[in-house]
Amino acid sequence: MANIKSAKKRIKVTETKTLNNRMIKSALKTVIKKFEAAVAGNNVEEAKTVFVAVTKSLDVAASKGVVHKNMAARKKSRLAAKLNAMA
């Protein structure tokens, strides 16, 4: 356990940031699964609307540093390819 005041603060801050990052990642995974389900069900209209949400979520996560920007770009590219294959 930390004895120095700044170390104690860092522990609190790290726990808070970890929780926020976990929430963002969880929401991201949920919306990606929703998109995958729409693609699997051949629901083009729903897939298009969910794709916009996926793109926004990936951009937010990348801008906040939760995921790497290249990972976000790769995911968007692969999901866009799936969407285009449906149409």
Curated annotation (Swiss-Prot):
Taxonomic lineage of the native organism: Bacteria, Bacillati, Bacillota, Clostridia, Eubacteriales
The alphabetized UniProt keywords are: Ribonucleoprotein, Ribosomal protein, RNA-binding, rRNA-binding
Primary gene name: rpsT
Q: What is this protein called?
A: Small ribosomal subunit protein bS20
Q: Which InterPro entries match?
A: Ribosomal_bS20, Ribosomal_bS20_sf
Could you tell me what this protein does?
Answer: Binds directly to 16S ribosomal RNA.
Family, similarity comment: Belongs to the bacterial ribosomal protein bS20 family.
- PANTHER family in the record: 30S RIBOSOMAL PROTEIN S20, SMALL RIBOSOMAL SUBUNIT PROTEIN BS20C
GO function term, MF aspect, one: structural constituent of ribosome
Read off the NCBIfam families from this record. S20
BP terms from Gene Ontology: translation
A single GO CC term for this protein reads:
small ribosomal subunit
What Gene3D superfamilies does this protein map onto?
Ribosomal protein S20
Q: Which domain of life is it from?
A: Bacteria
Ribonucleoprotein found in the keyword field? yes
